[in-house]
C-alpha cells in the first residue's frame, strides 16, 4: 500500500521591519497605484543585517519543532539562492543552531525560486521509502535587486519551514507532478554579485510559458482538468505575477468556479502582499496565506505552480487534510506581521547598505534592537556569529 505523504506542519518568519510601498513609490517618482495595483505589493519586509537565511530559517523552524521532533528529524533540505558560503551548507549551520540530532543529513538545494519545491519533492519521495522519517524542508531567502532598480518594488525576505512526514496534518501530496527545465537567462546571480541580474519582463513571460507547459502536461498525465481543483497556489515574486498565471487558465472554468478560484487567489496573495518576495519560500507563504484567509474544506484539491528562474517550473497537487488548521499557528503569524515596525525610505536605504560586508573583516553588528529568538551578531575570524536569546 502506498503511504500518504506530505506537509505536516508549516512555520514562517519574516523580520520585524517593513517598508510601505506607497511611500517607496512616492520616493521613486512613481504613482503609488503602480506598486499597489500594477505590481500588487503593499508592504515589503526589510531585512536587518542581524538576520540572514540561517537565522530566519531557525526562527521559522523553531515554531514547528518540539524537543521530541528535533530528535527525530532525519534530514534537512535547505532551499535558498542567498547562500552564505560556497562550500558549507546553510543546513549544517541551521541543524546546529536548532540543536538537531547529529544523526541528520543536512544539505543545501539551489535552483533560484524552485529550491524549496525540489526539497519538498525529494523529502516526500524519501518519506515514501522511509515512512517513519521526518524531513525538515526550508525555503529562505533575501530578495535583493538594488536601490532604485525596476526590481526594487519586488524585494522582501523571510523563511518558510515545513515538516514532511507520513500521514501529514496539512496536505497529502499527489504522486504525479509535471516539471520542465530549460537553460534561460531571465534572472541569475554570478558569485561575484550580491544583487541579481534580471530581465523582469522576459522572466514574466517565461514564467507564464512554463506554467502553460506543465499544466498541460499534468492534465495529460492525470486526466484531471480545472474542475478537479478548488484552488491554485502560485509562486509569487510579486502578487500580480500569480494573478496573471491564474488568468491564463480561468477561461477553462465555468463562471461559478471562476468566482471561487478568484476568491481563493485573493486569500492566497494576502500575506505575500504584505511581506514581499521570499524567492523560494514565496509559494509556501502563499499556501499559508490561503490556509489562513481562504474558505477551504478538508478534501479540497490544491494545485501548485513553482517557478525558479534559469529556469525550472513544476506543477503538482495535493489534498487538504481534516486537521490542517492544527499544522500552523495562524495567530502567531498575525501577531508577527502586526508587530512589525515601519521604517522610512531613508532608514530602509541605510539598512540595505548595512548588510554584512562581502569581505573577511571582523564585524560586530548592532544587536540591541533585535527581537528575534535567533540572530546574527557579526563575524569573527571569518566565521558568522550566530546567537540565540
Ligand atoms: N496604476 C495601476 N497600474 C499601473 C500603474 C498605475 N498608475 N502604472 C503602471 N501600472 C501597471 C502596468 O500596467 C503593469 O501591469 P501589467 O504587468 O499587468 O501590464 C504593472 O503596473 C507594472 O508596470 P511596468 O511598467 O511593467 O513595471 P516595471 O517596468 O517597473 O517592471 C517588473 C515591473 C515586475 C518587471 C520589475 O519590478 C521586475 O523586474 N521585478 C523582478 C521580477 C522578478 O523577480 N522576476 C524573477 C522571478 S519570477
Residues of each region from the PLM?
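Condensing-enzyme catalytic core mediating Claisen C-C bond formation in acyl metabolism
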Residues: 1-50, 149-205, 209, 316-389
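Acidic, glycine-rich active-site loops and adjacent beta-strand->loop/helix elements
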Residues: 11-13, 79-84, 111-116, 139-144, ...
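A conserved active-site cap/scaffold subdomain adjacent to cofactor or substrate pockets
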Residues: 201-222, 227-246, 250, 271-276
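Catalytic phosphate/nucleotide-handling subdomain of diverse soluble enzymes
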Residues: 288-337
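Conserved catalytic cysteine-centered active-site region
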Residues: 34-38, 42-54, 82-134, 251-282
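Short, well-ordered amphipathic alpha-helical segments that serve as non-catalytic structural scaffolds
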Residues: 31, 53-68, 90, 206-222, ...
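Conserved beta-ketoacyl condensing-enzyme motif
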Residues: 7, 53-113, 223-249
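Flexible, glycine-rich active-site loops centered on histidine and acidic residues
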Residues: 128-161
Amino acid at each position: 500500500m502506498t503511504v500518504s505523504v506530505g506537509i505536516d506542519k508549516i512555520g514562517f518568519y519574516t523580520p520585524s521591519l517593513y517598508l510601505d510601498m506607497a511611500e517607496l513609490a512616492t520616493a521613486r517618482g512613481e504613482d503609488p497605484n503602480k506598486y499597489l495595483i500594477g505590481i500588487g505589493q503593499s508592504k515589503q519586509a526589510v531585512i536587518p543585517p542581524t538576520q540572514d537565511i540561517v537565522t530566519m530559517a531557525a526562527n521559522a523552524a523553531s515554531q514547528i519543532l518540539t524537543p521530541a521532533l528535533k530528535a527525530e528529524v532525519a534530514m534537512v533540505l535547505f532551499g535558498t539562492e542567498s547562500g552564505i558560503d560556497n562550500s558549507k551548507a546553510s543546513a549544517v549551520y541551521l541543524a546546529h543552531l536548532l540543536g538537531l540530532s547529529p544523526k541528520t543529513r543536512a544539505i543545501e538545494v539551489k535552483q533560484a525560486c524552485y529550491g524549496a519545491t525540489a526539497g519538498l519533492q525529494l523529502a516526500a519521495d524519501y518519506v515514501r521509502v522511509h515512512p517513519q522519517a521526518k524531513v525538515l524542508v526550508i525555503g529562505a531567502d533575501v530578495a535583493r535587486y538594488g536601490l532604485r532598480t525596476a526590481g526594487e518594488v519586488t524585494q522582501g525576505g523571510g523563511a518558510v519551514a515545513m515538516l514532511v512526514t507520513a500521514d501529514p496534518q496539512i496536505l497529502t501530496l499527489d504522486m504525479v507532478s509535471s516539471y520542465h527545465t530549460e537553460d534561460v537567462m531571465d534572472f541569475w546571480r554570478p558569485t561575484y554579485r550580491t544583487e541579481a541580474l534580471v530581465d523582469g519582463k522576459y522572466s514574466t513571460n517565461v514564467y507564464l510559458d512554463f506554467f502553460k507547459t506543465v499544466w498541460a502536461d499534468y492534465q495529460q498525465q492525470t486526466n484531471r482538468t480545472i474542475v478537479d481543483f478548488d484552488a491554485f497556489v502560485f509562486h509569487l515574486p510579486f502578487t500580480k505575477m500569480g494573478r496573471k498565471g491564474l488568468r491564463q487558465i480561468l477561461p477553462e472554468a465555468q463562471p461559478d468556479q471562476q468566482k471561487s478560484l478568484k476568491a481563493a487567489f485573493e486569500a492566497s496573495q494576502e500575506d505575500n502582499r504584505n511581506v514581499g518576495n521570499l524567492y523560494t519560500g514565496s509559494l509556501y507563504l502563499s499556501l499559508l496565506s490561503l490556509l489562513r484567509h481562504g474558505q477551504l474544506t478538508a478534501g479540497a484539491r490544491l494545485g501548485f505552480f513553482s517557478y525558479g528562474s534559469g529556469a525550472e517550473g513544476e506543477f503538482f497537487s495535493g489534498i487538504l487534510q481534516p486537521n490542517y488548521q492544527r499544522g500552523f499557528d495562524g495567530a502567531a503569524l498575525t501577531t508577527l506581521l502586526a508587530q512589525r515596525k515601519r521604517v522610512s525610505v531613508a532608514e530602509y536605504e541605510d539598512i540595505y547598505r548595512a548588510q554584512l560586508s562581502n569581505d573577511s573583516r571582523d564585524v560586530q553588528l548592532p544587536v540591541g534592537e533585535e527581537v528575534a529568538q535567533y540572530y546574527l551578531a557579526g563575524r569573527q575570524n571569518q566565521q558568522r556569529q550566530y546567537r540565540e536569546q
